[in-house]
Regions:
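Hydrophobic, aromatic-enriched alpha-helical segments typical of multi-pass transmembrane helices
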Residues: 1-193
Length: 193
């Protein structure tokens, strides 16, 4: 079954909202269940974004070379974030529940940390590259503005993380808030036609 643009936009919106709800749940409760939910939604969200971006690329007839580059960068995001979060859920927290002391530099959410670096590469570098390839390959002016803005935010957050952990938080404005706004915009435009 081919996913159309409206369904992709709705999926993107639902995925982002579910992600933000899971994040808020963890920030409020600080429970292992909420953290597992948040990490699971991060992986699921990456897959939803991959599908949504590929549908957008098809609908707006992005050039084949740029579509391939986009697919590679999206796959990088999905693969790396899956490695980071599945390692956190399946290894790190299991070791901790067994009483093993795991150094912070192996934990997601700690800085500096191996898992956070993997996630920063996934969401900062590869997702930034994805937005930039969309910008380069699409003719629609509004989507170009959204995509270049989101791409720059992701890449600035990625580069900023080398200097300070707090500079990383520029990136979620691109892949989180920006992607949500872009999906809402696409949905509203699709409904107006």
């Amino acid at each position: 079954m081919k996913v159309n643009l409206k369904r992709a936009a709705i999926s993107g919106i639902i995925g982002e909202i579910a992600y933000f709800i899971s994040m808020m749940l963890f920030l409020i409760t600080h429970t292992n269940f909420a953290l597992t939910l948040w990490e699971s939604m991060t992986v699921i969200g990456a897959i939803v974004m991959l599908i949504a971006f590929l549908v957008i690329a098809d609908e707006f007839k992005i050039k084949p070379l740029l579509r391939r580059l986009m697919t590679i960068s999206l796959s990088g995001t999905v693969f790396l974030t899956s490695v980071a979060h599945c390692t956190s859920i399946g290894v790190i927290r299991k070791l901790e529940s067994q009483g093993t002391t795991v150094p912070d530099y192996f934990k997601i959410g700690a800085f500096p940390s191996i898992e956070m670096t993997i996630d920063y590469v996934a969401w900062g570098f590869f997702m930034g590259a994805d937005f930039i390839t969309l910008f380069l390959g699409i003719k629609d002016k509004a989507i170009r503005i959204f995509s270049v803005t989101c791409g720059i935010l992701c890449l600035c957050g990625f580069i900023g993380s080398f200097f300070s952990d707090s500079l990383w938080y520029i990136a979620p404005l691109g892949y989180g808030i920006g992607f949500l706004i872009m999906c809402i915009f696409i949905l509203k435009r699709k409904e107006a036609k």
